[in-house]
Amino acid sequence: MRNRQMLIFIIVVLLVAWPIYQLVDLYLAKKSEKDSNILLYQVSLFQIELLNNLIYDSMNASNTEQLNVLKQFAYTSDYSHQHLVLAYGDSKLTNMNSFLDIMQYIIRLQLGGDRLLKPEEVAVIQELNKAFTEIIEVYENLLSEDGKIISSQNDKLMQLDEVVSEYLRKILLE
């Protein structure tokens, strides 16, 4: 009789404890996902800050070969931002086409091999520097303290990205 009561008690405890354990596990899993999204955002921000610094440094470039590092960081910035878009969803975070447009512009400059940059090509890099200074300011404030995308900042980011993309595409079509 005592064994039977003990068995019933254990079953009741398991029936109560198991759902509580599942709820705690679910909460911790969501927290872990949120933390990983914040870390991914920090990586993406770091990549874009590096890209911005390289754009600034590239204003002093004298030939097309010196733009290789800028091209590589445009790619890594695009790569990290695309993964951030995948993590948050493209309905919450905009894709940034300007990274690929920067790559295309540099590739176009380098098609003729290593040559001196023309003054108008350096002027394009100077315009990119101005634009990316604004993009960095917006990107730094893209996430709220709890790790969610701030839609007003995302809208600003989308507008700035469109301006840069349209500018580069216009130049690429010349």
Predicted regions and their residues:
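Transmembrane signal-anchor/signal-peptide helices with a preference for the extracytoplasmic
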Residues: 17-39
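Alpha-helical segments in soluble extracytoplasmic regions
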Residues: 54-115, 143-167, 173
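Short, Lys/Arg-enriched, disordered terminal segments
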Residues: 1-7, 172-174
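Short extracytoplasmic/periplasmic juxtamembrane "stem" segments immediately C-terminal to an N-terminal membrane anchor
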Residues: 34-51
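Hydrophobic membrane-insertion alpha-helices, especially the h-region
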Residues: 4-23
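Extracytosolic low-complexity repeat regions of secreted or lipid-anchored proteins
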Residues: 131-148
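Surface-exposed, polar helix/loop patches in the mature regions of secreted/periplasmic/lumenal proteins
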Residues: 103-133
